[in-house]
């Protein structure tokens, strides 16, 4: 394995699993050259911070548009031309897509050029681009069982969702009154507002918070903490060391993207999930139920979310450390900490398959 392209974009939920696989590939093959092809969003900073080369392509989501709208979108023409040039120039042994519209053209370009391809589908309900690509790639890696037959069974392997090593190593349930709050890499206004509204109750209960707000809401949330006499030093737009943040928390309040759900499980943390209600096919609710049905998490629909409801739920759980530890153990039972390794090994398999056929 000499050269690999990883491709996705949009949010940390897509990018972090790809980076976990990149880390695993570099551990196995230190001389392997990795190129990350993404969109024009926050992925460039995340990827370059990890020391990986990055190329950007135009990409734009077409939520609810279906397959026809993907192919009729204006950006796809220039993105395909650029992707074909990048793949032809880099000459990778394989290209792995991790979902999102930014990852569509590079995988399709690689397939057209005869390069071995694979995708990873992280959600319980596949997105439109992966449903298209699943028909042509050599291997489909899935986080959840494909109950809807979205992908050909013969080439689909359930591996879980790759999780960053620092989160896997963060340890189990901490016996503290610290709650980690985040709404994904870009924040979540509904969660931020509910936390602010419940701060007085949380302060009275002696609960401390570490809060990732996203850039847009940072000042508003910081002022809310300040006005309630809460520590603003633990409020930030983005938490770079999530392993440390998970390690010090005894409870997590968050959205339910697949990356988040599998991170929470790998860290062995009980959670209160507040699924994003406008996610495609409401996949976040399906993701959250995977842990809630095990008794590892609570689920609050955003329509029912408010400061009092959230604060009361946090206080009730923090007061019962035995229950929290039980929830954390159940979360760990769901975790798939070998997902990155399974994907790296699977990609090696499809490269070897091409090599054998080429030599025949």
UniProtKB/Swiss-Prot annotation:
Classification via InterPro entries: GlcNAc_MurG, Glyco_trans_28_C, GlycoTrans_28_N
GO annotation terms (biological process): carbohydrate metabolic process; cell division; cell wall organization; lipid glycosylation; peptidoglycan biosynthetic process; regulation of cell shape
Annotated UDP-N-acetyl-alpha-D-glucosamine binding sites: 11-13, 123, 164, 185, 239, 284
Chief place of localization: membrane
Pfam families linked: Glyco_tran_28_C, Glyco_transf_28
Catalytic activity: di-trans,octa-cis-undecaprenyl diphospho-N-acetyl-alpha-D-muramoyl-L-alanyl-D-glutamyl-meso-2,6-diaminopimeloyl-D-alanyl-D-alanine + UDP-N-acetyl-alpha-D-glucosamine = di-trans,octa-cis-undecaprenyl diphospho-[N-acetyl-alpha-D-glucosaminyl-(1->4)]-N-acetyl-alpha-D-muramoyl-L-alanyl-D-glutamyl-meso-2,6-diaminopimeloyl-D-alanyl-D-alanine + UDP + H(+)
Keyword RNA-binding assigned: no
Pathway(s) the chain acts in: Cell wall biogenesis; peptidoglycan biosynthesis
One Gene Ontology cellular component annotation held by this UniProt entry: plasma membrane
Gene Ontology MF term list: UDP-N-acetyl-D-glucosamine:N-acetylmuramoyl-L-alanyl-D-glutamyl-meso-2,6-diaminopimelyl-D-alanyl-D-alanine-diphosphoundecaprenol 4-beta-N-acetylglucosaminlytransferase activity; undecaprenyldiphospho-muramoylpentapeptide beta-N-acetylglucosaminyltransferase activity
EC code(s) of this entry: 2.4.1.227
Keyword Transmembrane on entry: no
Protein's membrane topology: Peripheral membrane protein
Compartment(s) of residence: Cell inner membrane
Matching CDD domains: GT28_MurG
Alphabetic keyword roster: Cell cycle, Cell division, Cell inner membrane, Cell membrane, Cell shape, Cell wall biogenesis/degradation, Glycosyltransferase, Membrane, Peptidoglycan synthesis, Transferase
Record-linked HAMAP family: MurG
Family designation: Belongs to the glycosyltransferase 28 family. MurG subfamily.
Described function: Cell wall formation. Catalyzes the transfer of a GlcNAc subunit on undecaprenyl-pyrophosphoryl-MurNAc-pentapeptide (lipid intermediate I) to form undecaprenyl-pyrophosphoryl-MurNAc-(pentapeptide)GlcNAc (lipid intermediate II).
Name listed for the protein in its UniProt record: UDP-N-acetylglucosamine--N-acetylmuramyl-(pentapeptide) pyrophosphoryl-undecaprenol N-acetylglucosamine transferase
């Amino acid at each position: 394995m000499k050269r690999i392209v990883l491709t996705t974009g949009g949010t940390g939920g897509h990018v972090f699993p790809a980076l976990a696989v990149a880390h695993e590939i570099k551990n196995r093959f230190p001389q392997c050259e990795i190129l990350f092809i993404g969109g024009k969003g926050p992925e460039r900073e995340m990827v370059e911070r990890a020391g990986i080369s990055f190329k950007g392509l135009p990409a734009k989501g077409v939520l609810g548009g279906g397959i026809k709208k993907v192919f009729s979108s204006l950006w796809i023409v220039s993105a395909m031309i650029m992707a074909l040039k990048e793949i032809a120039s880099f000459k990778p042994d394989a290209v792995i897509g991790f979902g999102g519209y930014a990852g569509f053209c590079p995988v399709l370009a690689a397939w057209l050029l005869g390069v071995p391809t694979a995708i990873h589908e992280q959600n319980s309900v596949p997105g439109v681009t992966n449903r298209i690509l699943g028909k042509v790639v050599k291997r489909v890696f899935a986080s959840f069982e494909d109950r809807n037959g979205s992908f050909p069974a013969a080439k689909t392997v359930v591996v879980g969702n790759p999780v960053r090593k620092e989160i896997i190593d963060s340890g189990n349930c901490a016996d503290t009154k610290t709650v980690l709050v985040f709404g994904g890499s870009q924040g979540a206004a509904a969660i931020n507002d509910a936390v602010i509204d419940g701060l007085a109750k949380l302060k009275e209960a002696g609960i401390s918070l570490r809060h990732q707000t996203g850039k847009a809401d940072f000042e508003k949330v910081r002022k809310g903490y300040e006005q309630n006499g809460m520590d603003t030093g633990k409020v930030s737009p983005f938490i770079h060391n999530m392993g440390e943040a998970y390690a010090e928390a005894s409870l997590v309040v968050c959205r339910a993207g697949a990356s988040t759900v599998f991170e929470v499980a790998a860290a062995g943390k009980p959670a209160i999930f507040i699924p994003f209600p406008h996610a495609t096919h409401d996949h976040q609710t399906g993701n959250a139920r995977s842990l809630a049905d095990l008794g590892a998490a609570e689920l609050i629909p955003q329509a029912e979310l408010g400061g009092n409801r959230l604060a009361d739920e946090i206080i009730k759980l923090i007061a019962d450390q035995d229950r929290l530890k039980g929830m954390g153990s159940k979360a760990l039972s769901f975790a798939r900490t070998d997902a990155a390794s399974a994907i790296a090994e699977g990609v090696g398999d499809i490269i070897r398959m091409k090599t054998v056929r080429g030599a025949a």
